[in-house]
Amino acid sequence: MSRTNLPIQPAKMSDATSSKPQIFSIQDLKQAASDKMSQMYRDYYNGGAMDNITLATNEAAFDRYLLRPRVLRNVSNIDMTTTLWGTKAALPLGVSPSAMHRLAHADGEVGTSKACAARHIPMILSALSNDTLEDVSGQSSDGSTPYAIQVSPFKNRQITTNLLNRAKAAGYKAVVLTVDAPMFGRRLDDLRNGFSVPPGFSFPNLSAQTQSGSGGLGGGIPDLSFDTGATWEEKIAWMKSQTDLQLWVKGVTSPLDAQIAIEQGVDGIIISNHGGRQLDTTPATIDILREIAPVAKGKTRIAIDGGFRRGSDIFKAVALGADFVFVGRIAIWGLAYDGSNGVGLALDLLINEFKLCMGLAGCSKISDITPAHLSLLNAKGVLEGVY
């Protein structure tokens, strides 16, 4: 099925006002986007597993890390650029994989990609996307924006092989293996809402035999059984035998697993608790980064997602040792608010906030950002070093 024939699911459910609200922050954007979505899809994107404790903790944890700016530094020329997957990126910010962008807006993943490509922001495409991986990467007409394809440990390995081959041919730079979801988390809002997707919703990157049934998320989701017997040694070796794309693993939350990932020779890890959507009451990812960075820094690339809402949050992650930060819901909120233009608005907010934070903290380039720019406010209200 071609992209133009894919069903369109309007996100807006009310025409109470034709004027757009003023958006000055990601929190403004979240509210405006949520107002446009139906309850079912708003709860699907905004909610987490069980009691949403991890979801809330991911965001709240940033408030304990306080900025310690250096002054009288030359910040007349701020360079935010870095590299990812062997390609230059505008700043250490990318878009995480999230499924079914067309539930938020008809622009879908192509709309998200268009906004990313215009700003040289890397994007990880979910296997459960509504647009073809070729159309998504095609938004970077000159190939200067790096893309990665996300895969899960599917029991049917031909699904993974097909995705890897297509991604390689389409110029993708990496594959991101999700390792924290051998089964779906218990998401109470989705159960209460009877979550399903519109009839005829398509997943063009998956083989025809997976296109019917329920994959554990709800009605209309492809029947994708996960390999619950997958192990580090066997799975990583098999993935490497199937592709020469960079191999990253997403969903690492233990220093012990970070060490195993290094031993298995992965190119990078993404510290992630799935945005609080899998196992509730896990620690905030920014706190986990503080544990993992001393183990992994200099041995593999370190990225992180979960709870990022401000440019200063990105700064804090870099100061703690992250090479890169990914955001998922923020792109969805932008998409729901105003399609591809809304994604651009979301990214611009973070870009401008990050640049401002660098300047006010006395940093003119990424390598200037160090742990000395942070203090941790402990439970006694006393500032202490982060390392």
From Swiss-Prot:
Superkingdom classification of source: Eukaryota
Family: Belongs to the FMN-dependent alpha-hydroxy acid dehydrogenase family.
Cofactor: FMN
UniProt domain FMN hydroxy acid dehydrogenase: residue ranges: 18-379
Enzyme nomenclature, EC number: 1.-.-.-
UniProt cross-references to InterPro entries, sorted A to Z: Aldolase_TIM, Alpha-hydoxy_acid_DH_FMN, FMN-dep_DH, FMN_HAD, FMN_hydac_DH_AS
Active site location: H274 (proton acceptor)
Designated gene of the protein: FUB9
Role summary: Oxidase; part of the gene cluster that mediates the biosynthesis of fusaric acid, a mycotoxin with low to moderate toxicity to animals and humans, but with high phytotoxic properties. L-aspartate is suggested as fusaric acid amino acid precursor that is activated and further processed to O-acetyl-L-homoserine by cluster enzymes aspartate kinase FUB3 and homoserine O-acetyltransferase FUB5, as well as enzymes of the primary metabolism.
Induction text: Expression is positively regulated by the secondary metabolism regulator LAE1.
Name of the molecule in the record: Oxidase FUB9
A Pfam family reported for this protein in Swiss-Prot or TrEMBL: FMN_dh
Enzyme class (EC, first level): oxidoreductase
Phenotype caused by lack of the gene: Does not alter fusaric acid production.
Ranges where the record places region Disordered: 1-20
Binding site for a 2-oxocarboxylate: Y44, R187, R277
Pathway: Mycotoxin biosynthesis
